[in-house]
Amino acid sequence: MAEEKHQHHHHLFHHKNKEDEGGPVDYEKEVKHHSHLEKIGELGAVAAGALALHEKHKAKKDPEHAHKHKIEEEIMAVAAVGAGGFAFHEHHQKKDAKKEKKEVEGGHHHHHHY
């Protein structure tokens, strides 16, 4: 017998659209969800940035372990940039959800004038 292989894709956020399940999409819930994740990203960026500055300060005050603190500073700086990127991504997801909500509820047609 041949073994059946099942491929499972694991994602950090198991984000499913209601449309994929056959139900209507709650756009207000989508907007709130992305807004919440955007705020989490912003907070992560601020926290990681503060920790990077703290490690920079520790590197100056503790010359014996300065190299360790500089490495930790750089790690936190990268984390801050990553969190900022995540917040930026969620901001655009939120904008898209708002746009879809407006199109579905209002039935507005966009006319482009060039």
UniProtKB/Swiss-Prot annotation:
Region (Disordered): 1-25, 88-114
Basic and acidic residues composition-biased segments: 97-107
A Pfam family the protein falls into: ABA_WDS
Ranges of compositional bias, category Basic residues: 7-16
Family the UniProt entry places it in: Belongs to the abscisic acid and water stress-induced protein family.
Designated name of the protein: Abscisic stress-ripening protein 2
Originating gene: ASR2
